[in-house]
């Protein structure tokens, strides 16, 4: 994903702009993996996997293993919000089954 694309992206949930929270791999102006976050009071997170921004409501859980690789590099508040999202997702799946 080109860095210049970030300014054109919008969170589907909050309608706010997306910001690059963390970038793990970059090749020149391309982001290979990282994490985008909404610029709103209720934060929503979207991973960038293999250069593709995954901007879907369940993408954080779908790509959980990719996000877990670099979660320790985020600030404590973001780490907690993301981990709580993973826990909630597991709880919901358990309740459905």
Write out the residue ranges for each language-model feature.
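Conserved N-terminal segment of class I S-adenosyl-L-methionine
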Residues: 2-97
């Amino acid at each position: 994903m080109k860095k210049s694309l970030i300014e054109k992206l919008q969170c589907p949930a909050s309608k706010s702009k997306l910001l690059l929270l963390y970038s793990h791999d970059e090749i020149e102006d391309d982001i290979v993996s990282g994490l985008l976050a909404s610029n709103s009071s209720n934060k929503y997170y979207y991973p960038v996997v293999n250069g593709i921004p995954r901007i879907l409501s369940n993408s954080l859980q779908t790509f959980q293993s990719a996000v877990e690789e670099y979660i320790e590099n985020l600030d404590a508040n973001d780490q907690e919000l993301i981990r709580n999202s993973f826990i909630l997702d597991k709880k919901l799946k358990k309740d459905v089954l």
